[in-house]
Curated annotation (Swiss-Prot):
Signal peptide: 1-18
Gene3D superfamilies: 2.30.29.130, 2.30.30.640
Lineage, top ranks: Viruses, Riboviria, Orthornavirae, Negarnaviricota, Haploviricotina
Glycosylation sites: N28, N181, N338, N362, N369
Transmembrane stretches, start-end: 462-482
Protein name stated in the entry: Glycoprotein
Single biological process term from Gene Ontology: fusion of virus membrane with host endosome membrane
Functional summary from the UniProt entry: Attaches the virus to host receptors, inducing clathrin-dependent endocytosis of the virion. In the endosome, the acidic pH induces conformational changes in the glycoprotein trimer, which trigger fusion between virus and endosomal membrane.
Motif stretch (basolateral targeting ex vivo): 496-505
All ranges on the Virion surface side of the membrane: 19-461
PTM comment: Glycosylated by host.
Subcellular location: Virion membrane; Host membrane
Alphabetic keyword roster: Clathrin-mediated endocytosis of virus by host, Disulfide bond, Fusion of virus membrane with host endosomal membrane, Fusion of virus membrane with host membrane, Glycoprotein, Host membrane, Host-virus interaction, Lipoprotein, Membrane, Palmitate, Signal, Transmembrane, Transmembrane helix, Viral attachment to host cell, Viral envelope protein, Viral penetration into host cytoplasm, Virion, Virus endocytosis by host, Virus entry into host cell
Length: 509
């Protein structure tokens, strides 16, 4: 599974459970105009519940990862008597017959045969030789054991092995009877050992009210070090791999351990029969990678909004949403009023909304467990009412929440409407200190004059052809010069060679 598909999978789950947003909890905010330069520390991505005012308890949780399709190895051991019968009547010839009769195997003998196979000293007795006596019927037998590798499946909910050849289809022991009563299945593994291969132990912190053993546990949640959140709301108790534990609404299961989890476990209802548990998908490394990737993307989007503000470019509601904190607690809040960007300080609380367009921003205050409206301060700006961090009330009277691309929001026409957001220049701020015009960017495919582009292309080819021609002429001249040198050297050697007299000239003397 790729990272992008995993992000989409997480967003799909979140959309089914509600969209989390962070809203200011305070009603009286002191607004001040934003001063240039806009120096703002972009918030990191959190997407985690608000932990403000809640008690924290460190604990170690044991939770199943993805159960692989690997089977549990073992052996089928079969025992039988191999008989040879000799029928030698006084009145006729000998008749030899062979037969195999299954018997119940013994565990010790099966283990001995398995060890012999592992050591490479297997024995095959086969049928014994016949033993014939006149006027008699004689039978000789060998007890033969056969073992073959055979893997079965682990069923973690019931904590047993399953195979269609088992009596009843399931077994919990290291030695299991098979159909026919003449074969047994033997393994060195145990259910606990196989389950332990898929159970991971991770540190976490449980937040919430003091666990008093009543319905207040529903507001508690656990955040582990891999940023996974386990909410106790809608949880139930069930066994998994023969261990008591708590199954959460999103499918996660954690083993009941001593302390706080035991108190909560005893007060949650039991799960209905057939309840399934989901393992962690994907692995821990990819979970951390996705979390860090979201951090980088949202930080980049926030920095883009800061650049627009300092250059006094027009902003959209989506741009302002990138400045909003991604985690509860103390932080900055922004709004546009009369064309001026203003900033204040507040405490954020996480609530969940059904979608990007809602009637009101209602939610439950975790500090009081009371439901209330968190924001009702709207400033008229043209045809819409500006709220906070890009949240506004549109022409339809409904509240529009600009969910950014990380939260997979729906961008409508009003969200894309750009508006001027002036900021007040600081008297000691020199705008010339930051000039993007001074930064050189190489040509990266931007549009230009097509005539100039063609002329540059043709002139470039002309220069290349001229260089190629000059290189070719130089190579030809060098070749001719080498040939001349070789010819001159040959002629000089020939002129120095002494003349020889023939036998005819010597005979005339």
């Amino acid at each position: 599974m790729s990272i992008i598909s995993y992000i989409a999978f997480l967003l799909l789950i979140d959309s089914n459970l509600g969209i989390p947003i962070f809203v200011p909890s305070g009603r009286n905010i002191s607004w001040q105009p934003v001063i240039q330069p806009f120096d703002y520390q972009c918030p990191i991505h959190g997407n985690l519940p608000n932990t403000m005012g809640l008690s924290a308890t460190k604990l170690t949780i044991k939770s199943p990862s993805v159960f692989s399709t690997d089977k549990v190895s073992g052996w089928i051991c079969h025992a039988a008597e191999w008989k040879t019968t000799c029928d030698y009547r006084w009145y006729g010839p000998q008749y030899i017959t062979h037969s195999i009769h299954p018997i119940s195997p013994t565990i010790d003998e099966c283990r001995r045969i398995i060890q012999r196979i592992a050591s490479g000293t297997d024995e095959d007795l086969g049928f014994p030789p016949q033993s014939c006596g006149w006027a008699s019927v004689t039978t000789v037998s060998n007890t033969n054991y056969r073992v073959v590798p055979h893997s079965v499946h682990l069923e973690p909910y019931g904590g047993h092995w399953i195979d269609h050849e088992f009596n009843g289809g399931e077994c919990r022991e290291k030695v299991c009877e098979m159909k026919g009563n003449h074969s047994i299945w033997i393994t060195e593994e145990t259910v606990q050992h196989e389950c332990a291969k898929h159970i991971e132990e991770v540190e976490g912190i449980m937040y919430g009210n003091v666990p008093r053993g009543d319905v207040m546990y529903a507001n508690n949640f656990i955040i582990d070090r891999h940023h996974r959140v386990y909410r106790f709301g809608g949880s139930c108790q069930m066994k998994f791999c023969n261990k008591d534990g708590i199954k959460f609404a999103r499918g996660d299961w954690v083993e009941k351990t001593a302390g706080t989890l035991t108190t909560i476990h005893d007060n949650v209802p039991k799960c209905v029969d057939g309840t399934l548990v989901s393992g962690h998908r994907p692995g821990l490394d990819l979970i951390d990678t996705v979390f860090n990737l979201e951090n980088v993307v949202e930080y980049t989007l926030c920095e883009g909004t800061k650049r627009k503000i300092n250059k006094q470019e027009k902003l959209t509601s989506v741009d302002l949403s990138y400045l909003a904190p991604r985690i509860g607690g103390f932080g900055s809040v922004f709004r546009v009023r009369n064309g001026t960007l203003e900033r204040g300080s507040t405490t954020y609380i996480r609530i969940e909304v059904e979608g990007p367009i809602v009637d009101s921003l209602n939610g439950t205050d975790p500090r009081t467990n009371a439901s209330r409206v968190f924001w009702d301060d709207w400033e008229l700006d043209g045809n819409i009412y500006q709220g906070f961090n890009g949240v506004y009330k549109g022409k339809d009277g409904k509240i529009h929440i600009p969910l950014n691309m990380i939260e997979s929001g729906i961008i409508d026409d009003e969200l894309q409407h750009a508006f001027q957001t002036d900021i007040i220049p600081h008297p000691h701020y020199d705008d010339d200190e930051i000039r993007e015009d001074d930064i050189f960017f190489d040509n990266t495919g931007e549009n230009g004059n097509p005539v100039d582009a063609v002329v540059e292309w043709v002139s470039g080819w002309g220069t290349s052809l001229k260089f190629f021609g000059m290189t070719l002429v130089a190579l030809i001249l060098i070749f001719l010069l080498i040939r001349c040198c070789v010819a001159c050297t040959y002629l000089m050697k020939r002129s120095k060679r002494p003349a020889t007299e023939s036998h005819e000239m010597r005979s005339l003397v």
